[in-house]
Design a protein with these regions (language model features):
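Bacterial N-terminal signal peptides
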Residues: 1-3
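Mature catalytic domains of secreted/periplasmic carbohydrate-active enzymes
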Residues: 5-194
Length: 194
């Protein structure tokens, strides 16, 4: 990169840092999306009040080792699990709200698919990553870019606290993560523009 504002003798060489290089070297990764719509294909998370009950979520034959063994077989070096997508259903027993695996029959409400996924990744030498949608939550009637809509059971401040709690849980309870993936844009409020 050469800038016309620099002396012709002065050049800037941009190189990736160590973490950027590690990510580039991983080359092949997989994303695993396992959410409430797997069990309810007609479910539309934007239709507030129609979310499926956690009692219908019971992947009794789930095998995260099979997921990660398959990923390793295709040459993947990392895998990303969608821990919470737009439905708002959480694949770990979050303390932030009730729409999660803790209120499902899966492992009698004691299951934690995020923990199972991370353990499988470590077992097979695959670097674990987590995807979390913070800008949409059908259960709480929140839509991009993270705005609480009219009729929501929570205020914007309460939703922001829920997001903070869930992100703290995800980044604190599962050890070192290779990738953290956010989707859906950023809220461009006056606070963030200043």
């Amino acid at each position: 990169f050469t800038s016309p504002f620099l002396d012709a003798q002065e050049k800037i060489i941009v190189c990736p840092n160590e973490l950027q290089q590690e990510w580039a070297n991983a080359e092949i990764g997989v994303i695993i999306h396992f959410d409430m719509p797997v069990f309810h294909p007609d479910y539309n998370w934007r239709q507030f009040g129609t979310h499926p009950s956690p009692s219908t979520f019971n992947p009794s034959s789930l095998d995260t080792d099979q997921w990660i063994h398959t990923a390793k077989s295709l040459g993947a070096k990392y895998a990303v699990l969608v821990a919470k997508h737009c439905s708002g259903f959480s694949l770990w027993p979050t303390t932030a709200h009730e729409y999660s695996i803790k209120n499902s029959p899966y492992k009698n409400g004691k299951g934690d698919i995020v923990a199972e996924f991370v353990a499988s990744c470590r077992k097979y030498g695959i670097k674990p990553g987590i995807y979390a949608s913070t800008t949409a939550n059908g259960f709480l009637h929140v839509d991009n870019p993270g705005l609480v809509k009219k009729g929501s059971p929570v205020t914007q401040e309460e939703y922001n606290k829920i997001v903070e709690t869930q992100l703290t849980e995800l980044w604190s309870n599962y050890g070192k993560l290779f990738e953290i993936w956010f989707d859906g844009g950023v809220l461009l409020s006056a606070k963030w523009r200043s």
